[in-house]
């Protein structure tokens, strides 16, 4: 947009797969007298929600990631949800110099090889087992292990047929719903948060921290 021209042998764009913001056409939004923010265009300065009544519209990726942070600060938080979502804990860990030097750099080749041949390009060891060929106890143990590890490994590393066999998918979808019932103590609220209209993995998998 500055009129510059650049030539290169290779071009790698790192803008992400969803780079254009979508501001919904909500009646009265632009005449609203209070503060409002869009997660795709967040201000550089810190936003203070302390003691305020806050509403978050949407429980997509940005919603489930921002809601817990806002809830810690706001005096009252209301969430407007259209569609209940499957969401997996991220289990983020600190990336420090020791981690990079001792765990990442020595294993570059292996990490890249895993990503090259894995479904979706994630450096995860793919499972060769079907969710339907193991016992219920083994299946639950696998899901619990994946849940504890967090991230996309839960989907891509648990069983090979979660996105190709509806019966297999039903087992993981129900496991996630059981986790929601376990975390959300109010049964009525939990019921509203249970995704039932689509299989897990059929929409973009959401990764959260303390949602």
Predicted ranges, named:
Residues 8, 34, 51:
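Active-site acidic short loop of glycosyltransferases
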Residues 34, 39, 82:
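Active-site donor-binding loop signature of nucleotide-sugar glycosyltransferases
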Residues 63:
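N-terminal Rossmann-fold NAD(P) dinucleotide-binding loop
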Residues 1-30, 45-46, 59, 74-211:
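N-terminal FAD-binding dinucleotide-binding subdomain shared by FAD-dependent oxidases/monooxygenases
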Residues 50-60:
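Beta1/beta-strand and adjacent pyrophosphate-binding region of the FAD-binding site
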Residues 37-51:
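A short, basic/flexible loop-to-alpha-helix module at the beginning of a structural domain
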Residues 66-70:
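Aromatic pocket-lining residues of Rossmann-like dinucleotide-binding sites
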């Amino acid at each position: 947009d500055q009129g510059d021209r650049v030539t290169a042998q290779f071009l790698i764009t790192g803008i992400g797969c969803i780079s254009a913001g979508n501001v919904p056409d909500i009646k009265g939004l632009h005449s609203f007298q209070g503060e409002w923010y869009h997660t795709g265009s967040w201000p550089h300065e810190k936003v203070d929600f302390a003691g305020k009544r806050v509403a978050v519209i949407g429980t997509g990726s940005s919603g489930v990631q921002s809601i817990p942070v806002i809830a810690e600060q706001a005096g009252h938080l209301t969430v407007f949800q259209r569609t209940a979502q499957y969401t997996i804990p991220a289990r983020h860990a600190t990336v420090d110099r020791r981690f990079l030097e001792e765990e990442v750099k020595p294993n570059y080749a292996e990490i890249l090889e895993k990503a090259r041949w894995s479904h979706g390009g994630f450096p995860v060891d793919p499972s060769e087992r079907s969710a339907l060929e193991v016992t219920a106890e083994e299946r639950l143990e696998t899901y619990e292990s994946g849940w504890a590890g967090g991230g996309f490994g839960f989907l891509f590393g648990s069983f090979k047929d979660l996105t190709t066999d509806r019966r297999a998918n039903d087992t993981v979808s129900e496991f996630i719903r059981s986790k929601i019932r376990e975390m959300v103590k109010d049964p009525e609220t939990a019921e509203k948060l249970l995704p039932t209209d689509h299989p897990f993995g059929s929409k973009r998998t959401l990764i959260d921290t303390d949602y």
